Amino acid sequence: MDSEAISSDSHVAAAIATRRRSNSVSDDYSVQRTNDDATQCKYFAIQKGYWKDDFIGRFANSSANVAEARRFPEISMGYWARTAAIEKYVRGFLEEFDGNAQVVSFGCGFDTLFWRLVSSDAKLAKYVEVDFSSVTSKKIRHILKPGGSVDLKKSFESEAVVSHHADLHAGNYHLIGADLRQTSELEQKLATCQLDHDIPTIFIAECVLVYMSSNTSSSLLKNLVSQFRHPAFVNYEQFRTSDAFTRVMEQNLGERGIQLHGLEMCESAEKQEERFRNAGFKSVKVMDMNQIFNQFLDQDEVARIRQIEMLDEMELLEQLLAHYCVVFARV
């Protein structure tokens, strides 16, 4: 299906637009609400069997109805590919250093990767999550609430200590509320996590940098390279942003008060590579989500995914996947 056809499909266009996590100057509250959309979409896909996550139920509203647009198979397949790709990169990084490595997730939302890693006996030195304080305070309440089939606190190496209602410290796990655009605040909050700047550290950002100005995101990347001895970065965000598909996405997000301030960096693989190399990363690999789906991820799993909800045609899925990418960079 071509860009014009996708643009006229308001259901799919709105679904793609509203499921994203990000940081926006224009309306932070609207941006933070997209975390709820993403969590419900993931929960729906997991219930359908796209992947296993025993922990998402602690954060999702099981009684809420997922909007019709976000029940499209293409949406669930996209979330699966995104989740699987990020996890594969992180697991590979941790295994490379036999667990003597740290993970820092920017714009974490209600992500559950920490618990999925620990439950599978993956070794890691420390896992830090960062988001707006309004998001982390909610996540803390979900983590600490009694009842439920899974006790998230059992994954912590020490008793959870909460400060300012928005920060949680528990040995191997830290959750802090900070605005990534505010350098001094971010550095102060990260300091409370006692990260080791001399051991390998992988940073994650899923549709986060695109909502910051290009100068702000570039400054963030440069600071990481200067402050950490062995940093790596896995970045998931929009791609090929000069067509009608992106204009429709921008329009839908704009109606929700969300602006894509860093969209210029998402135009091409060359732009992405230039951004990371200018920040000091030596190795930069960019793959769109079609490449991720058809080459990077386990093809037996891809075959299984295709069988869950059979698609009449693949053009729409391919079009959606072509407009998102994963960047993996390291020094």
Curated annotation (Swiss-Prot):
Annotated catalysed reactions: [phosphatase 2A protein]-C-terminal L-leucine + S-adenosyl-L-methionine = [phosphatase 2A protein]-C-terminal L-leucine methyl ester + S-adenosyl-L-homocysteine
Keyword Transferase: yes
Known EC number: 2.1.1.233
Positions of S-adenosyl-L-methionine binding: R82, G107, D131, D179, L180, E206
Alphabetical UniProt keywords: Methyltransferase, S-adenosyl-L-methionine, Transferase
UniProt-listed InterPro entries: LCMT1 (IPR016651), Ppm1/Ppm2/Tcmp (IPR007213), SAM-dependent_MTases_sf (IPR029063)
Domain of life: Eukaryota
Any single Gene Ontology cellular-component annotation: cytosol
GO BP annotations listed: methylation; regulation of mitotic cell cycle spindle assembly checkpoint
One GO molecular-function entry: protein C-terminal leucine carboxyl O-methyltransferase activity
UniProt entry tagged with the keyword Coiled coil: no
Function as written in the Swiss-Prot or TrEMBL entry: Methylates the carboxyl group of the C-terminal leucine residue of protein phosphatase 2A catalytic subunits to form alpha-leucine ester residues.
Entry similarity comment: Belongs to the methyltransferase superfamily. LCMT family.
Protein name: Probable leucine carboxyl methyltransferase 1
Biological source species: Caenorhabditis briggsae
Gene, per the UniProt record: lcmt-1
